[in-house]
Amino acid sequence: MAPGKKVAPAPFGAKSTKSNKAKNPLTHSTPKNFGIGQAVQPKRNLSRYVKWPEYVRLQRQKKILSIRLKVPPTIAQFQYTLDRNTAAETFKLFNKYRPETAAEKKERLTKEAAAIAEGKSKQDASPKPYAVKYGLNHVVSLIENKKAKLVLIANDVDPIELVVFLPALCKKMGVPYAIIKGKARLGTLVNQKTSAVAALTEVRAEDEAALAKLVSTIDANFADKYDEVKKHWGGGILGNKAQAKMDKRAKTSDSA
């Protein structure tokens, strides 16, 4: 036989021969009994029996309820968030227009005061500031007046009723909008802990092209799919035990 080649396995498999090893008569096998009050139980995943802190318990219950119950399309649309790459580009643009901090504002006003004292206009000392707009009522009024160029909505606002109408309002007014994962991430854009919404009303000339590109990508994911998303309900997914029970019932009905 040529070197490197293996013999084909037997078609029906070779019968295994039992090894007759000599056993030590002094040792006895002691199979474990895992019944109640018997041997120490093997390690298992017991996280579902843990008594979690109340805030964790509420988070878990809320998550499970949103999966089990049927969720109307208006609320279910908040589970479709902006993809990671587009979100990174969006945050990169918005970070250029973060509102000024108290120290930055003080410095700007000092420069303006010095310029006015020298007989110049305050525009010479500091150019017009561009900033991200935030605050629910403020952003809603900007959308209604069609001043917002891009609106970001957080997907985890509680209660959700605060922002549930915003996608419909943006669609009606023709304002581009995107649903972003995490109100805390929006908060970083406006120097706050959290923010339900953030909007851009105007950008500098050098960022116009980047904004236009972002808007076209975001519209393809949200505004253009709005009518399709309205048709789909969320939730209604059974747990493992309930699913197994349904499968068993279906199997018995098929066999009958």
From Swiss-Prot:
GO terms for molecular function: RNA binding; structural constituent of ribosome. It comes from Saccharomyces cerevisiae (strain ATCC 204508 / S288c) (Baker's yeast). It is found in: Cytoplasm. The lineage of its organism: Eukaryota, Fungi, Dikarya, Ascomycota, Saccharomycotina. Residues 1-37 are annotated as: Disordered. GO terms for biological process: cytoplasmic translation; maturation of LSU-rRNA. Its main location: cytoplasm. Component of the ribosome, a large ribonucleoprotein complex responsible for the synthesis of proteins in the cell. The small ribosomal subunit (SSU) binds messenger RNAs (mRNAs) and translates the encoded message by selecting cognate aminoacyl-transfer RNA (tRNA) molecules. The large subunit (LSU) contains the ribosomal catalytic site termed the peptidyl transferase center (PTC), which catalyzes the formation of peptide bonds, thereby polymerizing the amino acids delivered by tRNAs into a polypeptide chain. Component of the large ribosomal subunit (LSU). Mature yeast ribosomes consist of a small (40S) and a large (60S) subunit. The 40S small subunit contains 1 molecule of ribosomal RNA (18S rRNA) and 33 different proteins (encoded by 57 genes). The large 60S subunit contains 3 rRNA molecules (25S, 5.8S and 5S rRNA) and 46 different proteins (encoded by 81 genes). Keywords: Cytoplasm, Ribonucleoprotein, Ribosomal protein. Signal peptide: none annotated. One of its GO terms (cellular component) is cytosol. Belongs to the eukaryotic ribosomal protein eL8 family. Pfam families: Ribosomal_L7Ae. This is Large ribosomal subunit protein eL8B. Present with 80200 molecules/cell in log phase SD medium. There are 2 genes for eL8 in yeast. InterPro entries: eL8/uL1-like, Ribosomal_eL30-like_sf, Ribosomal_eL8-like_CS, Ribosomal_eL8/eL30/eS12/Gad45, Ribosomal_eL8/Nhp2, Ribosomal_eL8_euk.
